[in-house]
């Protein structure tokens, strides 16, 4: 036991010595000091995007990007049209020949070779004269380039109209789809009045949409343009109700029902008055009745016409219907949060707009079914789809989604439309044969005194207009003939009698335009001492192969 006596006590009975507070290593133990207070690290936070980052106001950068995309779309459209190649189609040759005849009549008093106003589906003093002026300076390529310029302007107007109605993105999508349609591609390289008529309808529509916030009287600016469109192509009147409907709907949300109704009344009365005055002051009413209102019905079936309509315009129409349904369901077209606070048109208004634009695309097929003819259907489908295109643009933007969530779907849709447009346009532009060899063969046999029969008399009358007149050429679509004994013949019998008498100095048949009458003429020529076969010129077209058969009258 030591002096303290504690060493000899058992462990449980030991009394611990008091610990000194300043000795951290007492009894050979290390004591960890308490940790110092450390400030917590800041967590990662995403700052809120200021609304200024979603600015919807116009900007120079946005405008230039949009214009660049639109320019690219129009460049693609131009290339697709310019790549088409063939000699003049009979309609092109007819309008250009008529235009040259009208110019000679106006400037020199030369009698018209035919009464063009009686059977043209547009005024012969409007587009044919303009196209003939261009043709006289630049040839057929120049006349076709005029159509291309008009169709490019139409695409630009469609972009502007859609941007005004909906949004920038929808406008670019609408222009992109419209630019690659068969109708657009072909009409852009077609020297007929269709491109000019559609352009004028587009201008009238743009004026109506652009003046929606101006006083009602401003809509009268569209009146002369709309009337001129009808004068260029009488069937353009089919789309005047759509323009009137847009005059009502575009002004209603901003200027109220009274101003909107006044706009419609002003536009309807002024347009109707000008049309009535024009019909009364000119001799065009007979042409309107023969080619439009009282047109002879064909024999094409309803199912066939529906199939053709679906093939040539179904994809864009379905896209427009999808856009209309989505627009009715949700009107917002901008991703900016600011758009939620903007006043949007009501659902009833959106339903009416969707029905108006999409329903217009059905007018041409319905009218052609009524007439039971596929003639010009592909062009008229393009007229209707021009008005449905803004809704198709909305459909594409909804398909892609906000912030370009599904761009592959939009690319797939546009690529499909592009492939269809190219294939259909190539097929369309190859339907008629190349007439180069035929014109070269008959040129030495044609003069200003002879009388000629042709499946497509407009083509040689156009290419050989320096040597012959349109009045010298007889078509295979109806004929009257007085034989040498004074007997009168009409229809098929007229062809037989005229060939039997050797009335024609030259006969040119292609077997395509009217095969039934071609066979009648060929049978009448067979064994006829008045004629000998000058040549059988083979050709190839979209339907296969064929040949020009050319007979020339013998000397006796």
Task: Go through each PLM region and give its residues.
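Extracytosolic helix-loop segments that constitute the early lumenal/periplasmic catalytic or substrate-binding loops
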Residues: 77, 94-129
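Membrane-interface transmembrane helices that cradle and orient dolichyl/undecaprenyl
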Residues: 169, 204-219
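Hydrophobic/aromatic-rich transmembrane helices and adjacent perimembrane loops
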Residues: 187-188, 194-197, 238, 371-404
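Transmembrane-lumen/periplasm boundary regions of multi-pass, lipid-linked membrane glycan transferases
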Residues: 228, 240-243, 247-338, 346-349, ...
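Short periplasmic/luminal acceptor-recognition loop of GT-C membrane glycosyltransferases, typified by
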Residues: 425-436, 442-485, 500-517, 543
């Amino acid at each position: 036991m030591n002096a303290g006596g504690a060493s000899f006590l058992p462990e449980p009975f030991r009394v611990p010595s008091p610990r000194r507070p300043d000795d951290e290593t007492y009894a050979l133990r290390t004591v960890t000091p308490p940790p110092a207070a450390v400030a917590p690290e800041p967590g990662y936070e995403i700052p809120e995007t200021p609304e200024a980052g979603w600015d919807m106001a116009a900007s120079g950068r946005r405008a230039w990007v949009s214009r660049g995309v639109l320019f690219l779309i129009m460049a693609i459209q131009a290339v697709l049209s310019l790549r088409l190649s063939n000699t003049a189609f009979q309609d092109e040759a007819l309008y250009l020949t008529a235009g040259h005849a009208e110019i000679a009549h106006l400037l020199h008093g030369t009698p018209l070779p035919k009464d063009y106003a009686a059977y043209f589906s547009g005024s012969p003093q409007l587009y044919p004269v303009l196209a003939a002026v261009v043709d006289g300076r630049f040839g057929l390529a120049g006349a076709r380039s005029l159509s291309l310029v008009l169709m490019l302007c139409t695409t630009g107007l469609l972009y502007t109209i859609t941007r005004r109605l909906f949004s920038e993105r929808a406008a670019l999508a609408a222009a992109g789809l419209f630019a690659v349609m068969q109708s657009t591609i072909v009409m852009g390289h077609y020297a007929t009045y269709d491109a000019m008529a559609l352009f004028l309808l587009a201008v009238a529509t743009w004026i109506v949409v652009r003046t929606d916030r101006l006083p009602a009287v401003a809509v009268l600016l569209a009146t002369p343009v709309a009337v001129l469109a009808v004068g260029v192509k009488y069937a353009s009147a089919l789309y005047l109700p759509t323009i009137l409907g847009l005059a009502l709907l575009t002004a209603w949300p901003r200027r109220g029902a009274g101003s909107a109704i006044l706009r419609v009344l002003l536009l309807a009365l002024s347009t109707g008055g000008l049309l009535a005055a024009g019909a009364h002051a000119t001799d065009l009413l007979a042409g309107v009745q023969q080619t439009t209102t009282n047109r002879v019905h064909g024999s094409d079936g309803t199912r066939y016409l529906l199939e053709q309509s679906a093939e040539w315009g179904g994809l864009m129409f379905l896209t427009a219907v999808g856009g209309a349904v989505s627009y009715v369901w949700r009107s917002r077209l901008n991703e900016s949060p600011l758009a939620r606070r903007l006043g949007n048109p009501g659902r009833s208004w959106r339903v009416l707009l969707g029905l108006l634009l999409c329903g217009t695309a059905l007018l041409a097929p319905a009218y052609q079914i009524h007439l039971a003819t596929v003639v010009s259907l592909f062009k008229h489908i393009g007229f209707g789809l021009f008005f449905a295109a803004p809704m198709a643009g909305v459909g594409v933007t909804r398909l892609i989604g906000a912030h370009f969530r599904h761009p592959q779907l939009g690319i797939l849709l546009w690529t499909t439309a592009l492939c269809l447009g190219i294939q259909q346009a190539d097929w369309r532009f190859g339907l008629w044969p190349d007439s180069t060899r035929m014109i070269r063969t008959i040129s030495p046999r044609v003069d200003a005194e002879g009388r000629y029969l042709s499946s497509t008399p407009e083509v040689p009358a156009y290419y050989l207009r320096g040597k012959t007149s349109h009045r010298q050429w007889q078509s295979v679509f109806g004929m009257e003939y007085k034989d040498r004994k004074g007997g009168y013949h009409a229809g098929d019998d007229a062809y037989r009698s005229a060939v039997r008498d050797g009335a024609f100095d030259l006969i040119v048949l292609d077997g395509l335009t009217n095969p039934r009458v071609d066979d009648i003429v060929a049978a009448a020529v067979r064994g006829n001492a008045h004629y000998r076969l000058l040549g059988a010129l083979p050709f190839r077209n979209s339907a296969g192969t064929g040949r020009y058969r050319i007979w020339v009258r013998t000397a006796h």
